[in-house]
Amino acid sequence: MKKVPTLSLALVVAGAMLVGLGVTTSGTASATEPRSSSPVPPPYQDRYNALRSQLSNFAALPGRTVPHSPTIIASGLEPANGNLMRPGVLNTNLLSTATTLAHRMKTLGETGVTIQVNFPLLLSSFPDSAEYTTFYRDIARVVHQEGLTLAVEQNPLFGNISTLPVASFYAGLTLQSYAAADHQMAQTVIDVMHPTYLSILTEPDTYTAVIHQPDINLNSPTIGAQFVNLVMDGLQKDGTLVGGGTGSWINPSYDQLLLAQTPIDYLDMHVFPIAQSDLSNMTSQVSSAAAAHKTIVVTECWLYKQSSGGTPLDNVQAAPDEQKIETYSFWEPLDQQFLTTMVRYARSKKFAFVSPFSTLNFFAYQTWTSALDAQSSQLVRAAFNQKVQAALSSGGLSAVGKTYQHLAA
């Protein structure tokens, strides 16, 4: 979900591509080192080399191969993302599409599913909440029937993509009123969906930007801990594990405070940039969780390519550019290496759950050309969409998808 515009564009693409399509899988991954079928273009060569070096540093982190690891291998169920909800959703094929994809995820070998059920969709005071509650009840039943472990991210709706009246709902929220409403929704998620994992805070910087109210500054670790405590106070968990955390680009002292001053059951850690500072933060987060006797759940991870500097770029054009370059096939070897290293590391450190973010890349990439690269992000993504649609219809997987299938086996 890092950053706001990045998620926005990713979800628009996911919604456009997945609604109404069946997803099938085939093939297995090679155990050999991944090789690029496309040459790295000169404009990206330096960044590619830097990221490849960072991946080597990631792979060199202490850890050992763990055979028969219990770590849940999952990915996001994009058609069920709350940012795609609309009035009348039960009269569309969105539930059918989400159901089909859940079936295919199990066929791929995955043992878990991540769903974003966004605040305030399930609040009784929010328009059409009964319909959204029914949708999530039904898709949760499908996930449970498939024997998949369900993780829910309770992130706020993104006002820049959702057509729902979320801006007016956010207006005037205070930390206390937001936490009280989030508590109410968390209880509904538990009662209706019965997830194994429920994350109530994952990227405090993104939450702060999305809610955009002067009294809600979750960038402060102290305020973040206060928020988590308010949401969890009196929550009837009924077997659901409730957690929170940050991204690997955020100072690990934030997570240390959450572990020390809140009753979270696990630490949720998002992994995108992997510069040395991010890897250092990540290893500190892992050590802190172990010292607190808490497991780690990774509800989102992917190799960030817009910069190799370790901090996600935060201007208006950065996120569309990231989504644009994600489509190019010369990145496939790095994405394969990232997923392989991420899963190995998660298993070696006994993470409970790991779930990649850019699942459309499991199905297709496209060849870079200078002419394509000169086009807008919207046009590049439109061309990518056609390739994803063809792969979904034919049952194909990209090399990255085959790698993940091999990892999940």
Named regions from a protein language model:
Residues K2-A31:
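Secretory targeting and sorting signals
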Residues S26, A31-P87:
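Mature N-terminal, pre-catalytic/accessory segment of carbohydrate-active enzymes
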Residues H68-S75, V113-I115, L150-Q154, T196-I200, ...:
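Hydrophobic faces of well-ordered beta-strands that scaffold small-molecule active sites
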Residues L77-T97, S168-S177, T246, K324-L334:
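Active-site mouth loops of central-metabolism enzymes
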Residues N91-P120, A151, P195:
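Catalytic domains of carbohydrate-active enzymes, especially glycoside hydrolases
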Residues L101, E153, T222-A225, G239-V242, ...:
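Glycoside hydrolase catalytic-domain groove-lining segments
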Residues L123-F135, N160-T262, Q276-A291, Q337, ...:
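Active-site cleft segment of glycoside hydrolase catalytic domains centered on the general acid/base Glu
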Residues V297, C301-A409:
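Substrate-binding cleft of secreted/luminal carbohydrate-active enzymes
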